[in-house]
Amino acid sequence: MSSGGLLLLLGLLTLWAELTPVSGQDRPKFCHLPANPGPCRATITRFYYNSDSKQCEKFTYGGCHGNENNFETKDKCHYTCVGK
């Protein structure tokens, strides 16, 4: 195979890896935890991965404790639990 063909193949494999969503088995375990606002009383908008709907959804975080399924932005949630 020529060097141009190898570069094309490498480029296609890289593109495929970037566009392939994360499978349920590849997600961090905390992505399957329910939203947990914690015991504090702040009203901070955060996002969590809902494993039933398979989407990142908004919830109100109280500001302390909770769990790791708690993201400042929908993009961070999506990148971590849905895929790149």
Curated annotation (Swiss-Prot):
Keywords of the record = Disulfide bond, Protease inhibitor, Pyrrolidone carboxylic acid, Secreted, Serine protease inhibitor, Signal
Entry annotated with the keyword Disulfide bond: yes
CDD domains attached to this UniProt entry: Kunitz_PPTI-like (cd22608)
This protein's record includes keyword Signal:
yes
Superkingdom of origin: Eukaryota
Instruction: Using the record's annotations, give every residue carrying the modification Pyrrolidone carboxylic acid.
Output: Q25
Which N-terminal stretch is annotated as signal sequence? 1-24
Coiled-coil positions:
none
**What residue ranges are annotated as transmembrane?**
none
List the PROSITE patterns hit by this protein, alphabetically.
BPTI_KUNITZ_1, BPTI_KUNITZ_2
**Which Pfam families does this one have?**
Kunitz_BPTI
BPTI/Kunitz inhibitor domain sequence ranges: 31-81
**Annotated positions for site Reactive bond for trypsin:** R41, A42
Give any Gene Ontology cellular component: extracellular space
In Swiss-Prot or TrEMBL terms, this protein is called: Kunitz/BPTI-like toxin
- Classification lineage: Eukaryota, Metazoa, Chordata, Craniata, Vertebrata
